[in-house]
Swiss-Prot record:
One of its GO terms (cellular component) is ribosome. Residues 97-169 form the PRC barrel domain. An accessory protein needed during the final step in the assembly of 30S ribosomal subunit, possibly for assembly of the head region. Essential for efficient processing of 16S rRNA. May be needed both before and after RbfA during the maturation of 16S rRNA. It has affinity for free ribosomal 30S subunits but not for 70S ribosomes. It comes from Geobacter sulfurreducens (strain ATCC 51573 / DSM 12127 / PCA). HAMAP family: Ribosome_mat_RimM. This is Ribosome maturation factor RimM. Pfam families: PRC_RimM, RimM. Its main location: cytoplasm. The keyword Chaperone applies. The PRC barrel domain binds ribosomal protein uS19.
């Protein structure tokens, strides 16, 4: 199995009901990607990775309920609790222009419009109004709002994100 195109999605937190459904906590907070999957790759506590067909996926409160083939009862899935879920990138649904999956943004080099390297995009914090990019520089961490006025360009091919931070933002 090629692991270079596997993208981290979430974690199995518990079971649901007696028919072998699993509750998945999405790391990105969005569900559409998980709901669209035909297969999911689970990495167990032992580090072993297994691929399972998705029989059904639905949203339940702040989690996704997954039914995986061939499981039909709770006893068959108990060993999957705490497994981390991945999917192959080519299964993700297409996005609108200017939209990006978090997994595609993490690791981008962040530079100012003037060409100054700020650091690498390390993680993303979801907030009510907009996401916040956590950028690790050489000696500190920067919080960059993910808004059009600040994020000028994302070039996935070049591996860069160009930002035009308001005066003083990088001094905070």
């Amino acid at each position: 199995m090629r692991q270079d195109d596997l993208k981290l999605l979430g974690k199995i937190v518990t079971t649901h009901g007696i028919r072998g459904q699993l509750k998945v906590a999405s790391f990105s907070g969005e569900f559409d990607t998980i709901l669209s999957l035909e297969t999911v790759v689970l990495k167990g506590k032992d580090g072993r990775m297994e691929t399972f067909p998705v029989a059904r996926a639905t949203v339940h409160h702040d989690r996704v309920l997954l039914s995986l083939t061939p499981f039909t009862n709770i006893n068959e899935v108990l060993h999957l609790i705490s497994a981390v879920s991945y999917a192959h990138r080519d299964q993700f649904p297409p996005l609108e222009e200017g939209e990006y999956y978090w997994c595609d943004l993490i690791g981008l080099q962040v530079v100012t419009a003037a060409g100054t390297v700020i650091g690498r995009l390390d993680s993303i914090l979801p907030t009510e109004s907009h996401d916040v990019y956590v950028v690790r520089g050489a000696d500190r961490e920067y919080l960059i709002p993910a808004v059009e006025d600040v994020v000028v360009q994302v070039d996935l091919e070049a591996g860069t994100m160009t930002v035009s931070p308001p005066e003083g933002l990088l001094d905070l």
